[in-house]
């Protein structure tokens, strides 16, 4: 039957109750799946190639399987299970004594959970046992043709790095529900995202130091491939041997306190419990004593099966053959113990070494023949391990080279501080494969790329700078902010010209003060307005780009500030007019306002004519000015009032500044403040028509107010001296008077108060002084001696 190893390209196919599963050629070439199990649910409308693959995918789906993670079914009570490697150390429960539990737990616990797959038909261990039978001795196959120890170790290292990456962001805390005081519970991100109702519990119990039983051996494939998934109806079909699990003594259970020798049981201690992460029968668990017997079982005959197993024997025969082989291997095979170096019967050892530090796991010689244990003893596997080789595969244990380098997990690079073998040892040679590091982040990939994309597609982003208050150090804080939150928009670059490809030269000194102007490439500047090329101009605010846009970007400014005169070096040195100044010296002067007077001995006839016209106009202007002065003096002599005013004025000393005169004289003339047009001097004196004398009968009688009306008007006047329209209407209705009568009474009342107080309007007094007051009150003021003009003079001045 064709197996999954024949798939060369990526192929998608559907299987029951799942959406889509994709397999790539790299995972298929590793051939971890072996032969698909039999007895599963029937698959319809699938080819001979896809049918075994879909059945195998349904039984073995996990983090490290060749199958991509797929969408889990909502109706299933078992989820697609959080990653088994997400916790460096799982919770040790005394109530459980098996490696994995197949019963789905419908509880509200937050433990990291996974499930063991049901073993149906032939698995990888069955294939190995069948391949070691005499029926296949002449086939020429080699055990584990494609699954060598280096590949298994590579999977283990990937598992280790994924665990460490996820433990960094996990919640590590004490679990009060556990009896063991040092038990630590880790909740990683996948475990938080996994629904509680769709999960199965994993518990680590004590493991007996003996040959692997059928239940433990059945988990071999699941430990290599990750964690599988099953439905509810398949839970009852599990092939775990519960009797063997119950036979394990409580005194021999795994105890967390054993880890105290190597380090505290926390993920940050730097120690990985391989036994807590892989089954004891797995070849990945190199520290388990039972693993040696399993390895001897794998390589006992010297012949094996490859990726194409064509045996047609029944499943029952294979299972029985496996049991017999395992019992024989347990009784007959005795090898040196990896812990104490002595021969231990039954694969047991007094000192049980289950932990390796991260430094030891990352050593290049880890897993090789010369690997040194944690206590310094050399781990020497059996001779069968070193001599097994064939033309198709490379030796697994005899190769001194390793596919792994010492890697510092904090810096993600090689670290000399980590323990590594000396350069003289044969195991310290260069590795044939690249060193194993954690996945490179997107930001690191972006930093390695060139800035051509920025120069071509992200032009103009230099105008949108953040305020300096948010980022005190723009060259670093802005890069960190954008690189952390928007890695694909503006990645941090070391060259400022890459970040600001077409910025203006005068702004570069403000954005990057340390950048010299000589580094600017003029070919990258496509537009630079004329008034922005001055290097001496300072920006209005920090990182203000309003000048670049030609408008103000700050709404709180009503109008943009006026441009200051351009300052250049040497502007304070005003040139002095020197004889024989040439045009060249005039061009070098930077101050256009102060120019030296150029004197040339030879002048053209046109220049003479212009000079004559200028002289004539100047002489005419001087004559007109002299005439005005004479007229003014004559008018002052003829006018005695003006003489008196001139005599009353105080003559300011010659050294008095004009500012004092401005303080005394008002800025605006008084007539500007006149509210009536007739008060202005342009209107002239007010002309009044002569009124004809009226007879006694034609005179309008004065309004006789009653006592009540007068008292009410006085009260209203005391409250407010000015009437509003509504108030005037209400008073007219209440008192039985007209609105005009009430308005006139209020006006008369205000005039009497002003006259009795004797305080005159300062504006009127100022107008009277200037001879601009045209009312008849001038006569009264002149009679009282308050106005200096006579009535005739006032009329003459006003005219």
From Swiss-Prot:
Any GO BP: neuron differentiation
GO molecular function, one term: DNA-binding transcription factor activity, RNA polymerase II-specific
UniProt keyword list: Developmental protein, DNA-binding, Homeobox, Nucleus
Regions of compositional bias (Polar residues) in chain numbering: 210-222, 284-299, 377-401
Top-rank taxon, per record: Eukaryota
A GO CC annotation given for this chain: nucleus
Residues annotated as transmembrane: none
Protein location: Nucleus
Expressing tissues: Expressed in the dorsal ectoderm of early gastrulae in a band corresponding to the peripheral area of the presumptive shell gland. Also expressed at four points along the posterior ectoderm. In late gastrulae, it is predominantly expressed in the peripheral ectoderm of the shell gland and in spots at the posterior end behind the presumptive foot. Expressed in late trochophore larvae at four points behind the foot, at two locations at the base of the foot and in the peripheral ectoderm of the shell gland.
Metal-binding among keywords: no
DNA-binding region coordinates: 698-757
Pfam families named among the record's database cross-references: Engrail_1_C_sig, Homeodomain
Family in the record: Belongs to the engrailed homeobox family.
Physiological role: May be involved in shell and shell gland formation during development.
Name used for this protein in its record: Homeobox protein engrailed
Organism of this sequence: Lymnaea stagnalis
